[in-house]
From Swiss-Prot:
Signal peptide: none annotated. Its EC number is 4.3.1.17. It comes from Latilactobacillus sakei. Pathway: Carbohydrate biosynthesis; gluconeogenesis. One of its GO terms (biological process) is gluconeogenesis. This is Probable L-serine dehydratase, alpha chain.
Amino acid sequence: DIMLEAVQNAIATNEVNASMGIICATPTAGSAGTLPGILSVITKQLSLDRDAQIRFLFCASAFGMVVANDAMIAGATGGCQAEVGSASAMGAAAAVEAAGGTHQQSSEAFAMAMSNLLGLVCDPVAGLVEVPCVKRNVIGSVNALTSADMALAGLVSKIPADEVISAMKSIGENLPSTLRETGLGGLAATPTGIALKMQIFGQDMSIDK
């Protein structure tokens, strides 16, 4: 199954990251599983050779540079929408390019993918890039593939890519610090999240003590 393969490879990349292995930050370590999940699927489905895979990465990087220059790509400054959201949008645009779509279709895929993840907060349990980050990479991969399919089918984003990036920046700037990678809000602040932090570190790591 196409989606299950994306799930498998997105998780696998994040497992390597969690075990201190070598990964490529795309655009960050916390979102490093999203692009591999996408690329593994389209490489098989489209029979991409090495050059085509490299073009995929270049296309994704180009869109990522725009986000980095015009907004942000770090969870600490913009929440998870800036990490997995950006990675998903980058992958969607590159998937369209790999499938032979137009530049405009790549832009539409990018806009739809990022729009779908606007507002996603960064709330890592115990401050580690594992829970819920790994599974969010999966969502990023699947979101990218469906956004690419929609763009290739002729669907368009009513809001253009540049404006979606601006909206993401504005949302990120308005997120409270507790929801920007500090591990002090969201899932990290739940009873189970706090218990897991205590289990890992063996002490109260809160800043309020």
